[in-house]
Every structure is written in structure tokens, then in C-alpha cells.
Amino acid sequence: MRLPGWLWLSSAVLAACRAVEEHNLTEGLEDASAQAACPARLEGSGRCEGSQCPFQLTLPTLTIQLPRQLGSMEEVLKEVRTLKEAVDSLKKSCQDCKLQADDHRDPGGNGGNGAETAEDSRVQELESQVNKLSSELKNAKDQIQGLQGRLETLHLVNMNNIENYVDNKVANLTVVVNSLDGKCSKCPSQEHMQSQPVQHLIYKDCSDHYVLGRRSSGAYRVTPDHRNSSFEVYCDMETMGGGWTVLQARLDGSTNFTREWKDYKAGFGNLEREFWLGNDKIHLLTKSKEMILRIDLEDFNGLTLYALYDQFYVANEFLKYRLHIGNYNGTAGDALRFSRHYNHDLRFFTTPDRDNDRYPSGNCGLYYSSGWWFDSCLSANLNGKYYHQKYKGVRNGIFWGTWPGINQAQPGGYKSSFKQAKMMIRPKNFKP
């Protein structure tokens, strides 16, 4: 049943009065006049037209406490409006894209544009050709890479073969040149013979002193090449028949072997104790005659072993004092030709300030604190630091990789050291 308009308004006024009363009670108002009469008034505001009459409802000021959650309603409404605008924009963009696609697909709605159809066909044909060319280009690149790999392999093989061939030829020529040089040095020039009819003997190495009757080990002067100055060497006249020219000696650690290129070139130390004779002098000695090399080693347990090589030659400084050794014999093991990657034969001389080794990531001479014919890096190094006992850390001491038990040390553990080491040479044809 529908209530008449005036009855509905009366109900609204009554509800408003009750709300005001509750508000006054809540605020603690005790004014009798406020409790006696309802401040809400309903009264006519004009003439009636039929069953419809205008009314005016007057309400006092009313404060209602709203929940806190309604405070963020305005922000939420703003976000909703923003999202609605974004959605409307996307819808419009999609509609535009669809219209453009329809225009390109069927302009004018009749599908009769033959020019654009032909153009599309040409574009597809060009794309097909581009894809085909790209595939062929990729195949060509793969083939080029394969050929480059084969070429590098062949290049390395050829370079190794050429290097071995050249080394063999150089070794043979060295023997011949040394032989001829030895013969020529014994034949004085005619001018020299006329000026000095009585000749003094030239001692090219310690074996010449031995042949002439000297049997005491010590320092002697030699002239391996009459075109260069004479110099002193230490001669071992006792070991294995005598006549040995000592190139290097380690006895007590009194000489520092962590030296630069210039020091190893000229030589250093004390001939009576520890020394390196000098690469220039070693070159002259090994150039004048075909030499053999003997290495004597002794550890701190009293074990003494030796290594003998039937050929020994050191090139000049221009060739970086390259080492040439022959076949091995002895008891200490062939540490100079330990393996493929640790082979000191045919290697250049390296010092901490001159990197000529085969190690790609650093300087072996700098890492092992010495000058030597390093490979990548070492299986032998007689110029390492002198340790008076076993040591830890980098294996930078005197080292001979084939010594009994020397490689049994655990990584980071103690490493063996040597009490004595000596390198000496003698002519291959020497007979005590």
C-alpha cells in the first residue's frame, strides 16, 4: 500500500526529530526547551494542485560522525576515474588500429586494388630472398670458420715442423762453425807470425790447462775466442777425470740469484764460492768447442747424484741465450726434458725483468725469483733461492724435478731443498 505524500513527509519529520534527540543526548545537552519540542518543522510552502501540495522541511544543524574508512573514498574514486579513462583510451586505440587494418586489407571495401596486392606480393618475394640470402650467409660464415680452424691447425703443424727443422740445422751448423773456429784460432796470421816468432799458448777452457799439466782445482784465465777479452773461470780438475769449466755453483746461499737480465748476462758472485759465470761467457765457451754438460746435485740427506748431457750450447744475446742440450745419461734423471710441457731444451733465457718463456699468463722468472731457461714454467731450476732446510710456499728454491721423492710433497706442504748444485762443461772429445 502506497502512503500519501504528506504522510511520508510526516514520517520523515518524526525520524529527523528522533535523530536530533539522539544527537542531543550524545552531546550531553540538558536544555529543557531542547527536549520539550522537536526543532524539525514541516509546513506548506504554496497552493496545492490537485492532490500534490508543496511542503518545506526545516532541520537544525546536525553533525554525524562517519567511519574512518570513508576518508579514503575520494582517493579511490579518483583512481577509478583514472582507470576508466585509461580503458576508454585503449578501447579507442584498438578501434583505430582495427580500422587501419581493415583499410589496408580491403581499401574501399571492394578488394579491387591490384597495385597494392602486387606490391604485397613483391614485398613477400623480397622477404623470401632476404631470408634465403641470410641462410646462405650463415652457411658461408660457418664454412669460413671451419676453414680458419683447419688453417690454424695446419699453420701450427707447419710452424712446429719448420722450427724443428731450423733448430736441427742450427745445431748442425753450430757444430761445424765451432769446429772450424777452433781450427782457425790455432792458426795465427802471417803478420802475427812475423812479429812474434815465439807463440804463447791460448787456453780456451779448463781442459787446455789440464792437458798442460795443471791438476789443482781453482781459478784460471781462459780465452775461448781470441777476438774477445780473456776472463777467469773456476776449473774442476778432480771430478770424472778433471778438465771441467764450472758455469755455476751453489754451496751455502752466500750469493743472491734473484737478479736482472744484465747481471745474468755479465755474471756475478764469487768464483771460489757461489756464482753464475755469465751468459756471454757461456756462449763463447760453448761456441769455441763442442761441449758436454755435467750437473752434480746433493741434498741435505747426503744423497749425491748427477746428470750428463752429451751436447751443450748457449746462443748469443740476440737469440736470447737459447739453450741446446743433447742426450741424457746419469743418475739424477732427465729433468731438463721432463715432459712435453716441461722441456727446457731449445728454450730462451728468462729473468724477472725479461720474459722470454712459454707461459702465456705471466713471467716464470719473476714468479720463481731467478733467471733460467724456463718453459711453461719448469721441471728444473738450479738458480732458485737457496734454502737451508725444507720450505713452504712457492717452489722457488733449487729444483730438479726427477730427484727421488721430490714430488711427493702435498700441495701447501714442505718442499725439499738442495745443499749443493754445480753445472760444468768440458769438450766432447776430451780424454783425461
Swiss-Prot record:
Q: Does the keyword Nuclease apply?
A: no
Q: Where is the Fibrinogen C-terminal domain?
A: 197-429
Tissue spec = Constitutively expressed in cytotoxic T-cells.
Tell me the compartments it is located in.
Answer: Secreted
Question: Which GO terms of type biological process are on file?
Answer: blood coagulation; killing of cells of another organism; negative regulation of defense response to virus; negative regulation of dendritic cell antigen processing and presentation; negative regulation of macrophage antigen processing and presentation; negative regulation of memory T cell differentiation; T cell activation via T cell receptor contact with antigen bound to MHC molecule on antigen presenting cell
- Name the record gives this protein: Fibroleukin
Q: What UniProt keywords apply to this chain's record, in alphabetical order? A: Coiled coil, Cytolysis, Disulfide bond, Glycoprotein, Secreted, Signal
Disulphide bonds annotated for this chain are: 206-235, 364-377
UniProt main location, coarse: secreted
> Per the record, what is one GO cellular component?
extracellular region
Entry-listed glycosylation sites: 24, 172, 228, 256, 329
Recorded hits in NCBIfam families, A to Z, give: GGGWT_bact
Reported function: Converts prothrombin to thrombin.
Q: Where is this region: Disordered?
A: 100-122
Subunit structure, as described in the record = Homotetramer; disulfide-linked.
Q: State the conditions that upregulate or repress this gene.
A: In macrophages, during infection by mouse hepatitis virus strain 3 (MHV-3).
- Please, which domain of life does this record's source organism belong to? Eukaryota
Which organism encodes this protein?
A: Mus musculus (Mouse)
Q: What does the record list as coiled-coil region(s)? A: 71-157
| InterPro entries found in the cross-reference section | FIB_ANG-like, Fibrinogen-like_C, Fibrinogen_a/b/g_C_1, Fibrinogen_a/b/g_C_dom, Fibrinogen_CS
